[in-house]
C-alpha cells in the first residue's frame, strides 16, 4: 500500500489579489518526492489559494496510486 504525505500551501498578496499555490507529495516510507508543483492563480483570495493547493495535491496523489494520504497545511 502506497502511503504519502502531502504538504500544500497557497497565498495571495491582498484579499483578493495576485495569488499562487503549490504542493509537494512525499512517499511516507522513503521520503522520496512523488510530485512537486506550483503555479500562479491570477487574482484570488487566500482561501481559494490554500484550497487550490490542497485539491491539486490530492489529485496528484490519486494519479500516483496513493492509497493512504496524510495532508499537512498551515491553514
Label the predicted regions:
Residues 70-75:
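Short, intrinsically disordered, charge-balanced linker/junction segments flanking boundaries
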Amino acid at each position: 500500500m502506497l502511503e504519502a504525505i502531502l504538504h500544500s500551501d497557497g497565498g495571495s498578496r491582498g484579499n483578493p489579489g495576485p495569488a499562487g499555490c503549490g504542493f509537494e507529495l512525499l512517499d511516507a516510507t522513503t521520503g522520496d518526492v512523488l510530485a512537486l508543483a506550483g503555479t500562479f492563480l491570477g487574482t484570488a483570495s487566500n482561501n481559494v489559494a490554500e484550497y487550490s493547493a490542497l485539491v491539486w495535491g490530492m489529485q496528484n496523489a490519486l494519479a500516483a496510486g496513493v492509497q493512504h494520504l496524510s495532508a499537512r497545511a498551515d491553514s
